[in-house]
């Protein structure tokens, strides 16, 4: 036994970082604390002689040595850095120490504090009886490698192999997902350093891919406020040391180290703070909601766009795109989505039904937002009460069926989010502006543009509330009257009736490709206003040529 036993012991490395309310006189913006400890109630002091933290050279006395627990360093800084951490053992033989490379990353402004935990599993092959006893007292576990008779010191590979699968990255809780890199570190210190390197490399690529996929999942989950579920999943995985992957989604923004990013992401989700021997550690773990800044930014974008339109059941993609370029012109958006539109055009027939449904739901969203917001164009509502009343009924009717359809379609849309939302995004704006875009789509495209100054001439004429509703979609009519008034001071009844009819047909329009063409036409005039869910324009603000083009588009649909 003495000659052929393997002992595995776990360590937890982690750090906590948060923004200071006010920077220090030296310009330090963050307070951080980094620590090394044992899992849960394990006292690593039994086998750890000291822990050496190598801070950045910019710190005074960058070599910090802790000979007694808690093994931690607290400092203030303005940037993250890679910190080598050496754990020295109370061992009279090799290995005498193990060195970890720790990524001390900080949270960006506006993001939650960092609460990061990294679990490492150290595997000691054939330790001396004395050192083995110390390891066991610190929570170490005896592991008998298969084929113990043949596996003794000459073959370090056996112990290492088990460590790799066991290693889990970024355990926010106290999971002991050894990084594999650490296992490799220990083993390398013992016998084979090359193994350690290879393990780390393997683990990192896995982490990268996992973090990417997980980041996407996280974004969706956050939009749905499913942090709790993700947390539960993470907990379930903890024992397996595999739970890090789901939380990995949060990339550590400040740092490039994928491992810690994953850890961080897990820590945010692994909400349960591991009971750390040092109290500060425990508290640090709770805040572990520090999502990597990037994911959080993406999530914020998506969530904001979704927030405005999630109720109508609009595809998340649409919303994300809308929030994407908050201040880019719709034209840019159209160009970016042009590619998607092309792809869509081919399968468009097959997915036509879906698109129509989505456009309906989007339209409804636009109605809601517009009726609530009554954009400036709405305020410029037409001066004819009769036309106003006409507008209202048409919009109200469209709203009723839209909502019912949206409710029916929401479930379908969620299932078809990827394909349909992709289509919507593509259709939203085609570089040539030929892409089909439902009003809501164009709205989402321009929702980013909502910051764009409304180019519609503020109508001096009465702003009837009904018109604000009409704007629900583009409120083409309400907006249209004011400009014509501005231009001519008066307008003939025949033309007004024509515009009223045009408005009615626009509001009843459901063909996505035609909607896109109309949006493109209006964009060229510059007389439109964009909100989170609507694309508003004033028919009276358009010149007669543009109105004729709109009518021709509708005629094409009718035929």
Curated annotation (Swiss-Prot):
InterPro entries: AF-9_AHD, YEAST_sf, YEATS_dom, YEATS_domain. PROSITE patterns: YEATS. Pfam families: AHD, YEATS. The modification N-acetylmethionine is found at residue 1. One of its GO terms (cellular component) is cytosol. There is a cross-link at residues 240, 262, 342 (Glycyl lysine isopeptide (Lys-Gly) (interchain with G-Cter in SUMO2)). Gene3D superfamilies: 1.20.1270.290, YEATS domain. Acylated lysine-binding is specifically inhibited by the tripeptide XL-13m, carrying a 2-furancarbonyl side chain, preventing recruitment to chromatin. Residues 1-138 form the YEATS domain. Residues 270-281, 455-467 have a biased composition (Pro residues). Residues 147-484 are annotated as: Disordered. One of its GO terms (biological process) is positive regulation of DNA-templated transcription. Residues 56-58, 78-80 are annotated as: Acylated histone binding. Residues 305-324, 369-396, 437-454 have a biased composition (Low complexity). CDD domains: YEATS_AF-9_like (cd16906). Keywords: Acetylation, Activator, Chromosomal rearrangement, Isopeptide bond, Nucleus, Phosphoprotein, Proto-oncogene, Transcription, Transcription regulation, Ubl conjugation. Residues 409-421 have a biased composition (Acidic residues). Component of the super elongation complex (SEC), at least composed of EAF1, EAF2, CDK9, MLLT3/AF9, AFF (AFF1 or AFF4), the P-TEFb complex and ELL (ELL, ELL2 or ELL3). Interacts with ALKBH4. Component of a SWI/SNF-like EBAFb complex, at least composed of SMARCA4/BRG1/BAF190A, SMARCB1/BAF47/SNF5, ACTL6A/BAF53A, SMARCE1/BAF57, SMARCD1/BAF60A, SMARCD2/BAF60B, SMARCC1/BAF155, SMARCC2/BAF170, ARID1B/BAF250B, MLLT1/ENL and actin. It is linked to A chromosomal aberration involving MLLT1 is associated with acute leukemias. Translocation t(11;19)(q23;p13.3) with KMT2A/MLL1. The result is a rogue activator protein. This is Protein ENL. It comes from Homo sapiens (Human).
